[in-house]
């Protein structure tokens, strides 16, 4: 048996996630700029439309689609040719607490951030029990990432946010991480 060692430079490069670091820092800056950095953050790896549709689509489209079941609404949204419905839901979400961050780091992982203090839960199927805005959670939805890429991006995101001059570190209040996808565990087709 032999011990294999790596040079300090190689160890640093292997542990330094260039794209993931840029991705995470961009997102943490947006959280900071919107006073969301210290709120409870729930990280969800999912299709970009899933959380947005589940929060905003049922009440927004119920009458228009004459639907009695939320799943009928979700099915209508996933039908090709319903771009106008999808756009309507996205516009509503952007007006009511969703921030969309298109990736510019090279990870190709876009992000949606939902500030639940701006969501009127009486118009959703959900409730929020937090008493004041500082306690209301932030839903952080990252487009599906798997394997090494998921590890790299989450690893970098969970690190404290550093100021530009690197003198102050701010820790995130991560309440949960949900990275379970449907791939291989549920029936259905792509986009379900």
PLM region spans:
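Accessory terminal and edge-of-domain segments that mediate assembly/interaction
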Residues: 1-192
């Amino acid at each position: 048996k032999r011990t294999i060692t790596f040079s300090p430079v190689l160890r640093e490069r292997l542990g330094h996630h260039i794209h993931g670091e840029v991705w995470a820092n961009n997102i943490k800056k947006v959280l900071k700029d919107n006073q969301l950095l210290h709120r409870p953050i729930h990280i969800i790896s999912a299709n970009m439309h899933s959380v947005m549709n589940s929060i905003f689509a049922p009440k927004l489209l119920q009458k228009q689609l004459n639907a009695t079941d939320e799943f009928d609404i979700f099915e209508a949204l996933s039908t090709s040719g319903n771009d106008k419905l999808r756009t309507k839901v996205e516009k509503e979400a952007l007006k009511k607490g969703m921030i969309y961050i298109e990736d510019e780091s090279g990870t190709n992982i876009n992000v949606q951030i939902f500030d639940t203090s701006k969501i009127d839960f009486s118009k959703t199927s959900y409730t929020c029990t937090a008493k004041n805005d500082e306690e209301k959670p932030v839903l952080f939805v990252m487009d599906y990432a798997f394997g090494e890429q998921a590890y790299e991006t989450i690893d970098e995101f969970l690190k404290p946010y550093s100021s530009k001059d690197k003198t102050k570190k701010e820790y995130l209040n991560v309440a949960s991480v949900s990275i379970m996808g449907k791939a291989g565990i549920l029936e259905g087709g792509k986009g379900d």
